[in-house]
Amino acid sequence: MMTVTDLLHAEELPGLTLLTHETNLDAPILQANILENPDAFDWLTPGEILLTTGYIFKDQPCLQKRLIQELANMNCAALGFKVQRYFNEVPQEMIQLANDVGLPILSIPYNYNFSQIISLVNRRVNQPDETISQHSVHMHVSYTHLRAHE
């Protein structure tokens, strides 16, 4: 399992910055997705981190607020916002609303590709849980040992 805190501290992605209060940082990230389409609200799923440049809501404060509210309502893990592309910084209104609803917003440095973040999330989410793997091996060895002594 990967959490928002894990992503913020990932050695592979130095420079990710938390812009909101330290709320819901233990939220599990189940997948990463790119949000560059205003119709995408219909396809959001809980546990996603949504990555955006902000292009779809550049000059639309109402859509910026709707985005934060929709992500919070869907229990999305976080919003990753790539700055220095269409926005020099994340609008304060978005940060304030995200604080109010408990949605973490991460600032993504301009030089990062979204694929770097998606790849890391996919690797971490899909890697086998070491504890479960070790327990399975232990059970198999115990079972084999019992069968050998029957």
Language-model regions, residue ranges each:
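Alpha-helical/coil-rich non-catalytic "connector" segments in signaling and regulatory proteins
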Residues: 1-147
